[in-house]
């Protein structure tokens, strides 16, 4: 099992790095679209769409919409421009959705009676999770793209590394000190001590990146605000994890799929990032 997980992780990392460094913005966007479509396929089971044919139809319909959306933006993406007319609205939608998700998680299982048997509402949740995630990733990746193609890459990797490192910090802190359960009805393994460990990890990492980047990450933004945003982004990433756990628990599945050997499905790998990336993008570009 461990060998399988390690091999899968190596392949995943190689694929991500290849897409980040070698793909043009348009093809990078198409790769992201493929990830989103796989996420929708997995999400259809949360919406209690049990028949494979119905799941395939719904996924195909939404997948065509996503690819047409990205295709029509192809020239703008290659010019370093990302959904300029709709980006802020998409990210505001994401921030609002995660505010609602917090209420759903806190009140679970009582909240389930409002959404668990409503496929359309569940698919709306999927849209509010995955589409702003794609837009946020692209906006970060293409920041100052025409002047420096790697500036946005550094910014995007910062968010990814921040979330992944904080997740590791939370894991080890929870193992060592975890006593008080964070959300026992949703994810019994998570503790408040683990969350605090993750936030401390994020704080330390933010200082390190700011110091060694010579303020490239921050730009003309307030450093204190950037650090607060980094820590808040990690806090929101925990909500992304908890929200997917809630949907899986309600639908009676352990993993979103078995697509990635030893790691579960696509949603299992990006659940934290689907909350973190739009949240960070909105406040980084429109608030700070």
Swiss-Prot record:
Reactions catalysed: a 1,2-diacyl-sn-glycero-3-phosphate + CTP + H(+) = a CDP-1,2-diacyl-sn-glycerol + diphosphate
GO MF annotation list: phosphatidate cytidylyltransferase activity
Main location: membrane
Membrane disposition: Multi-pass membrane protein
Any one of the GO CC terms: plasma membrane
Taxonomic superkingdom: Bacteria
Pathway assignment: Phospholipid metabolism; CDP-diacylglycerol biosynthesis; CDP-diacylglycerol from sn-glycerol 3-phosphate: step 3/3
Top EC class for this record: transferase
EC identifiers of the protein: 2.7.7.41
Pfam families: CTP_transf_1
TM region positions: 10-30, 52-72, 89-109, 118-138, 152-172, 192-212, 223-243
Effect of residue 59 to A: In strain: 33
Cellular localisation: Cell inner membrane
Keyword annotations from UniProtKB, A to Z: Cell inner membrane, Cell membrane, Lipid biosynthesis, Lipid metabolism, Membrane, Nucleotidyltransferase, Phospholipid biosynthesis, Phospholipid metabolism, Transferase, Transmembrane, Transmembrane helix
InterPro entries cross-referenced by the UniProt entry: PC_trans (IPR000374)
One GO biological process term: CDP-diacylglycerol biosynthetic process
PANTHER family: PHOSPHATIDATE CYTIDYLYLTRANSFERASE
Family label: Belongs to the CDS family.
Name of protein: Phosphatidate cytidylyltransferase
Gene: cdsA
């Amino acid at each position: 099992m461990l060998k399988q997980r390690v091999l899968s992780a190596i392949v995943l990392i190689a694929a991500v790095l290849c897409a980040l460094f070698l793909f043009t913005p348009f093809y990078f966007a198409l790769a992201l679209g493929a990830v989103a479509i796989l996420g929708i396929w997995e999400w259809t089971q949360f919406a209690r769409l049990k028949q494979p044919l119905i799941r395939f139809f719904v996924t195909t319909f939404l997948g065509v919409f996503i690819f047409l959306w990205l295709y029509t933006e192809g020239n703008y993406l290659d010019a370093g421009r990302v959904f300029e007319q709709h980006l802020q609205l998409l990210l505001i939608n994401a921030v609002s959705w995660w505010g609602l998700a917090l209420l759903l998680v806190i009140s679970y299982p009582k909240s389930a009676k409002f959404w668990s048997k409503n496929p359309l509402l569940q698919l709306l949740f999927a849209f509010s999770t995955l589409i702003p995630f794609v837009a946020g990733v692209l906006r970060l990746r293409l920041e100052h793209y025409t002047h420096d193609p790697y500036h946005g890459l550094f910014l995007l990797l910062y968010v990814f590394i921040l979330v992944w490192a904080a997740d590791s910090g939370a894991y080890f802190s929870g193992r060592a000190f975890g006593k008080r359960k964070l959300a026992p009805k949703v994810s019994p393994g998570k503790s408040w001590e683990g969350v605090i460990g993750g936030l401390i990890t994020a704080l330390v990492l933010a200082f390190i990146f700011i110091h060694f980047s010579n303020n490239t990450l921050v730009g003309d933004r307030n450093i204190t605000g950037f650090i607060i945003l980094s820590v808040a982004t990690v806090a929101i990433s925990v909500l992304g994890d908890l929200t997917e756990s809630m949907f899986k628990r309600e639908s009676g599945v352990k993993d979103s799929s078995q697509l990635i050997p030893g790691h579960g499905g696509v949603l299992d790998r990006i659940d934290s990032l689907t909350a973190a990336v739009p949240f960070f993008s909105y406040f980084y570009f429109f608030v700070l």
